[in-house]
Every structure is written in structure tokens, then in C-alpha cells.
């Protein structure tokens, strides 16, 4: 705050669901400790930890926090869904648990603080690790998650069409129509048309 003054700055942190996905779902060697034999207890503790983190950022002067989350991009990918299913995971059930966990984390969010979510399919050296439209997670995430807005990757056909946006409630949506993966600029008129299409 002493540096930013009255300028609204955005801080980004991994979403609670990323913590769980990386440690407990992707990691095939994960074995729950005794306290977390019931996964609901772990979801709860992660959410409470995030409540404290959100408050700490607020007390430090942060009024705009973004949750970075690539787990939802994975949940859109048909091949990844198949792989997780073969390992015994029900991704729809996990997705509902993630939304509940995020909503619990946001329960103590002060009114004058904005929390948004950024969803993408990865971007490391202009490559990605998942593909697929938002339809598999749209109703669960867009229809029930209490963030103030979504930043959604829509820079290629890998992201599907705009129909999943029908589940958006009162949140703001930022469409990621400009790619960082290639040096060529998009045509301005094409970008305008895509925005109109999304409306």
C-alpha cells in the first residue's frame, strides 16, 4: 500500500483447488495422513487456511485478489478426464467439492475486496497441457462459484465456443481473446466479432 498509493493493484495466488489437485489428485503417490482419511476434512482445512490468507492480503492493503487455477482447464480435457476416471477419480464430484471449498474460503472476504479467478490450459514456452471447451465444468463452476469474476482463455479453438457462458450469474467475465503463444496480432475486427458473439 505504501508503494501503490491509491492505485488498485492485483495480487495473484494459486487457487485452493490447485493446491489439492497437485498434491492429492495428480500425485499418484499421495497417501492421506490419519487426520485426512475423510477428504472433506482436508477441503475444510484448506478453505480455512485461505480465509486467513485472504484476510492477511486485505490487511496489507490488497483489494483485488486473483485465484490462478489451471485445474478447471484439466477438467475440460476429455483425455485427462478419461485418465483420472481410470485412476478412480470422479471429476464432477471433485469439481463440486472444489467449488464448495472456494466458496468457504471466500465467506470471510470483506465487501470492498474483489476476488476473481483466472482459468487457462497452461502456457509454458507457448505450449499448453490441456484442451477442451468449458461445457464439462460450466454448470458446476460458473453456476455456483462465488468469485466476483472470471478470466477465461478463449484464444483458440481449444477453448470451445461461448455457450458455457450461459451459466454465468452476476459475475464479470474477461475473455482472453488475444494469444501470447504466437507473435502475430489478431485482426481487430475479428476480436470485436468474437466479443459480440459472446454477448
Specify the residue positions occupied by each region the protein language model found.
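Domain-level signal for soluble alpha/beta catalytic cores
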Residues: 1-199
